[in-house]
Amino acid sequence: MEIKTTAVAGTLESSDIQIMISKGSNGIEIDLESEVKKAYGDQIEKVITETLKKYGLENAKVKATDKGALDCVIKARTLAVAQRATETQDKPDLEVL
């Protein structure tokens, strides 16, 4: 699967995460901002990476701003941004979740 456009999903509200994705060429590169990065940063990055790979994306630049989102929210936002970036919103692949 290929990223066709830069896309954003999520908000900056409490218990949410905002994810922006754009084309990349060095695997999945994640720039994470989070108040809980020290404790949960590795887990947040793992959830984003696994979800993108399950969706078929191997190269992407990801900017994530976490406000205390649970894993299920991170997965949902990652799937939404991947669908928007690949312009496949009309063909949702919920198996990824």
Swiss-Prot record:
Subcellular location(s) of the protein: Cytoplasm
Q: Which domain of life is it from?
A: Bacteria
Keywords, sorted A to Z: Cytoplasm, Phosphoprotein
- The answer on whether this UniProt entry bears the keyword Phosphoprotein reads yes
Q: Record keywords: Phosphoprotein included?
A: yes
Q: Which GO terms describe its cellular component?
A: cytoplasm
Main location per UniProt?
A: cytoplasm
Q: What Pfam families does UniProt report for this protein, alphabetically?
A: ACP
Residues modified as O-(phosphoribosyl dephospho-coenzyme A)serine are 14
Q: Which InterPro entries match?
A: CitD, Mal_deCO2ase/Cit_lyase_ACP
What's this chain's function? Covalent carrier of the coenzyme of citrate lyase.
HAMAP family for this protein: CitD
How is this protein organized at the quaternary level?
Oligomer with a subunit composition of (alpha,beta,gamma)6.
Q: Which family does it belong to?
A: Belongs to the CitD family.
Q: What is this protein called?
A: Citrate lyase acyl carrier protein
Source organism per UniProt? Lactobacillus helveticus (strain DPC 4571)
Query: Corresponding gene?
Result: citD
